[in-house]
Amino acid sequence: MRRAIAGDGRGRDGLIQGPVAGLQERTMTQNSSTDATPGGHQLRFAHLERVITAQAGDTLFQSARRNGVRIVGACGGRGTCGTCSIHVVEGQVERSPHAAPGREPAEGRAPKKWQRACQLRALSDCTVEVAPRSLAPVVRADVAGSASAEPLPLDPLVRSLDMSVAPATLTDPAADAERLRRALPGQDLRLDLGALRELPRVLRAGSWSLSARLRGSELIGVASPGSPSLGLAVDLGTTNVAAFLIDLQDGRRMASLAIENPQAAWGADVISRVNHAVAPAGGDELRQAAITAINALAHDLCRAVDAVPADIVDVAVCGNTAMQHLLLGLPVFQLGRAPFVAAAGQGMDVKARELGLAVCPGAYVHVAPSVGGFVGGDHVSALLATRDLWAGATTSLVMDIGTNTEISLIHEGRILSASCPSGPALEGGHISCGMRAAEGAIERVGLADDGSLTLKVIGKKAPVGLCGSGVLDVMAALHRAGMADDRGRLNAEHPAVSVRDGKRAARLAEGVSFSQDDVRAVQLAKSAIRTGVELLLREAGLQSGDIARFIIAGAFGAYIDIRSGIDTGLLPQLPLERFAQVGNAAGLGVQRMLACGREREQAAEIAARCRYVELSTLAGFQKAFMQHIGFDTSMKATQ
C-alpha cells in the first residue's frame, strides 16, 4: 500500500525536480571569478558555465565546494568513497600530498579520464568536467504543489492584526510604543527590541496604520497593513533540507523546496559530522552551513510567492538529535560516545536572530522534542504525522529510513524507539555508481525471463548511474539471478560478473556496475535496520508477524519496492497490504507543529511516551546483526 503523506512536496529521493535559482546559484554569484585569490588557479566548469578560483593548498573538491559547485562527496572529501568523479579536460594537476588510498571511480570508466576530485590539486588553470552521477542536483520551488493535500490544523501561535494607531501630535506626543499599547488595551504588551526598532518607520510609512505580529502578549514584528503572515517549516535532514512555506492566516501550503544539506561537505553520515564538530571551529562551520541553507530556502520560497523573508513570523524545525544540536550550536562531543546523551531533549523556542535566521526580527524558532540517542525531533514529527495510521492498530511499527534510520514499535500504548546508523548506501551514497535521482539514473531493476537484468532509467536516457530507489532492486535481482549467493558474494563464473584487480563487479549497463564493495555496503545497511526491528520486537515480546501496520516514512522509503525490501531481508515477510509508504512524514509533522500550537503539545506527549532503546546494549545484538547480513532464500514477498 502506498499512501502519500500530505504536503510531501518532493520528487524522487526527496528532491523536487528541475533547475532553481537557490542556494547554489546565490553562492555562485557571491564567489565569482572576479574575487580571485592571489596566486590561485582558475577552474573552469564549462558544462556548468562556472569559473572559480582554487585557493592555495585546496583540492579540486574543496575548491568546488567552497565556491558553490556542488560535487557529491559522500565521505566529505576524505578519499574513501570514490563518488566525486571528475575529468580534467585541460590543465595540470597533482595528487594531493594528503591524498588517502581509497576507492577509485566506478569500474567501466577509463581510469585515466575519471579521477577523484578530493585527491587532486591544481598546478595551473584547468578545465574540469564533473561526472553526471557526481553532480549534486539543484531544485525548484514547488509553488502551491500540495493543494490537494489534507488541510493543516490551524491554531498558530502568531497572529497578525491590521490596526490603526492615533497619530502623534504636539498636544499628545506619547511614544510610539505607548500609542500602540493604547490601541491594544488589556494586552500587557511586551515589545521585542527588533520590532521596536521597526515601529517608527512602519507607523509613519503606513499613515499610522500597521500590521502587528503578536505571539501571545509579545509584539514580535510590525509590517504594513495587508502584509502576509507566513510560517516556515524545516525538515533538517542529514542528506537533504526541505522547507515548506505556510500561510498562517488560512493554513494554505504556499510553496515547498528541498536542497542538499551543505553539511555533506564534511561527510554524508552523522558520525562524520559529529567528529568534525569537535575539531576547532568545526561546530561553527556546520552550524553556519545549516543556517545558510535555511536562509536560502526562506529567500527562494518567499520570492516564489512574491513575499519577503521578513513576512515569516514563525519557524519550526525538526531533525535528528545531532542535526538539531548543530543548528542550535549545542555541543555534540557527548553524542559521539556512549551513552550518547543529548544536551537537551525537550522542545524549545529560541529567537530566530540568535541563530542568524533572516526572518521577522522577533520571530521564534520552535525546535521539535527528541526521544534519546539519535532518535530526534524528525522521528517525533513523523510519529505525529502518522498517528492516525498507527494509533488504530494493536501493534504498529514506524520506520523512517535514511542515513540515520529511526524505528518505533507501538504496542498497546507503549512506544519503544531506537536508531540504526544505516549510512547512505541505500540512498545511493558510498555506492561506486551511485547518484541522485536525475536523468540517466537507474531507478528500477528487474529480472527478465531469460535471467538478464531489466532497467528503468529516469528520462529514458542512457544509464550513467544508480539512484537510491534502484539499490534494493539491484540486490534482489542479483540474488534471484544467481549473480550473488546467500552470503552476498558475487559469482565470478557468471558472464555478467567481471573480476578486475581481484575485485568483482556485476555489469548493469555500459560504464555502470555494482561492485562487491557495493554489495557489502548494502548488506551492512539493511542488516543494521532489520536488526533494529527484530530487537525491538524481542524487547516487547513480539514476533514480526504481530505487526499489523508497518509504516515506512522518508523520501527514500516512498520509492523502494516493498518486494525488493522483503527479498533482500531489509523488511520482514509480511503481506504487502500491511505496509504503508507515506513519504516525508517528518516534513508533514513539522508543518503541523508550525500551524498549530496544540500539535506541539501532542508532539511533546508522544516524545514523553517513547522509551529509547540502545540496541548495542541488548543481548544478542551481534548475533542478530550477523544473522541478517546474508540473503535468506526463504524470504519472498507475498500478496
What are these regions (language model features)?
Residues 293-305, 379-386, 523-545:
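Phosphate/ATP-binding catalytic cores across multiple sugar-kinase/actin-like superfamilies
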Residues 39, 114, 129, 133-168, ...:
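Acidic, glycine/GT-rich loop-and beta-edge segments that sit at the periphery of enzyme/chaperone cores
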Residues 262-303, 430, 442-446, 521-524, ...:
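N-terminal phosphate-binding loop and adjacent alpha-helix
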Residues 205-230, 362-396:
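Conserved phosphate-binding catalytic cores of ATP/NTP-utilizing and phosphoryl-transfer enzymes
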Residues 236-238, 243-271, 334-349, 381, ...:
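Glycine-rich phosphate-binding loop of actin/hexokinase-like ATP-binding domains
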Residues 58-82, 89-117:
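Immediate flanking context of iron-sulfur cluster ligation sites
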Residues 411, 542-606:
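Catalytic phosphate/nucleotide-handling subdomain of diverse soluble enzymes
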Residues 31-34, 97-230:
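Fe-S ferredoxin-like electron-transfer domains
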